Amino acid sequence: MFVYHFRLRKGLTAAAAAAFTLLLALLLVLPGCQKQDAAPIPAGTDADRLAYLTGLGWTVEETPVETLDLLLPEKLKDDWANYAALQKEQNLPFADFAGQTVRRYTYTVTNYPGIPEGVQANLFVCGDQLIGGDIISLAENGFQTTLNFPEQKTA
């Protein structure tokens, strides 16, 4: 039979305890350093939606041109997948709401640079949270883009 005998030293014990504490702290802190999803953007009321658009630089008519309830498909394919990619660019969680009923609010934009009319802002809302949005032009050669106000080109 073998007997092992060892003696713990206070310095070594303290160093081991400190290393363990540091390792535990890193395990708890590092996950919090990962990129977090953006905080939900409130959009449950007209005032919330108008404040959001105004904060981005848009001037819109206060009353929506259209309010429409939509059931998003379970799997976002084709045009819906393209739209989800546009929302991901804006850090909006549109794709997370696949298969759910959402409400789209459409507002007339009155200050799109160089285009005095025919521009609209769409906001998709689920519950009280903004989940997506875009700016569209209804002109013959129209466009669809993010909600970000376009940069002005200086001469």
Segments (PLM) and residue ranges:
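N-terminal export/targeting and maturation segments
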Residues: 2-6, 25-83
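Short, small/polar residue-rich loop motifs at catalytic or cofactor-binding pockets
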Residues: 10, 116-119
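Short, structured surface segments that line ligand/substrate-binding pockets
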Residues: 12-13, 110
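Hydrophobic membrane-insertion alpha-helices, especially the h-region
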Residues: 14-27
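A short, structured loop/turn motif at beta-sheet edges
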Residues: 55, 97, 125-129
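Mature extracytoplasmic domains of secretory-pathway proteins
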Residues: 58-116
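A short, surface-exposed interaction/processing loop segment used at functional sites
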Residues: 118-155
